[in-house]
Amino acid sequence: MRVEEGRIPFRGHETWYRSVGDGPGVPLLVLHGGPGSTHLGLTPLEQLGDERRVVLYDQLGSGNSSKPSEPSLWTVELFLAELENVRQALGLEQVHLLGHSWGGMLAQEYALIRPEGLVSLVLSSSLSSAALWREESLRLRAALPSEIREPLDAHEAAGTTDDPEYERAILAFLHRHLCRLDPWPPLVEEVLRSTNLEVYRTMWGPSEAHPTGVLAGWDVTARLGEIHVPALVLCGRYDEATPLQAETIAQGLPDAELVIFEESAHMAPVEETDRYLATVRAFLARVDLRNP
């Protein structure tokens, strides 16, 4: 398969991208999570390059892209503009858009603009409401053993989330609701290690459970009916982006399918790679057939 890597100028910085495949299907553009994570956790999607072009990129501040240390930069508007810039630079006139976690939030925002040539959405382990995420996070927390739950609550209340005790407790939570493979594959370790905490904390906050940053009041649930492209909504049974959140998205969209991966948490592309890829592949093929 054809592989291409490059950098796209964007507002005085550069966005790094990787393009795999050049088959006849409508291209797939992939949006990673975080905010502040990288494309690495979604590299299994490159296997779909046997049927279509698959483009992954590191959002500004992340991975191989420019990393300006300017907290005022980190807004939804910036990342929407970057997405459109990537699409135009690479000539993606028609495109399927797959967003994972925060990337799914960005994908919903983009779809609400009703851009020309958007063929479908795949919303993977995502959310439509920061408030519902908070409620579901508290529910998941309540089910944790006290030796995990209490340090999480205490250090978040005290603002000491850099304390080693907190880090051990959050790691135990992540083994339940981020990735359930034991041990974690090196890919998962690298995704966590490479996260840009300035971007993450500015956009989301210091705690996974309690959004306090730019996205704290984010909610597009009431507007999902405005998105008229076919959509595939995905999550893991043990996902921190819980099945209730996935169901909320799927019910709000006019044309959506919902698939839950029974052995996965938040990283189904890594935890159940074969089933995840088969599910996405089949959906894209069905939509391509409907697309004139």
Model-derived features: positions:
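Conserved HGGG/HGGXW glycine-rich cap/lid loop of the alpha/beta-hydrolase fold
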Residues: 11-68, 72
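Catalytic active-site module of serine/aspartate enzymes centered on a nucleophile-bearing elbow/loop
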Residues: 255-292
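Alpha/beta-hydrolase active-site loop signature
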Residues: 35-36, 59-63, 103, 128, ...
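Alpha/beta-hydrolase
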Residues: 142-144, 150-229, 248
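N-terminal cap/lid segment of alpha/beta-hydrolase-fold proteins
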Residues: 1-14
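Conserved loop-alpha-helix segment in the C-terminal half of the alpha/beta-hydrolase fold
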Residues: 214-264
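Active-site loop/oxyanion-hole signature of alpha/beta-hydrolase fold enzymes
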Residues: 55-102, 106, 278
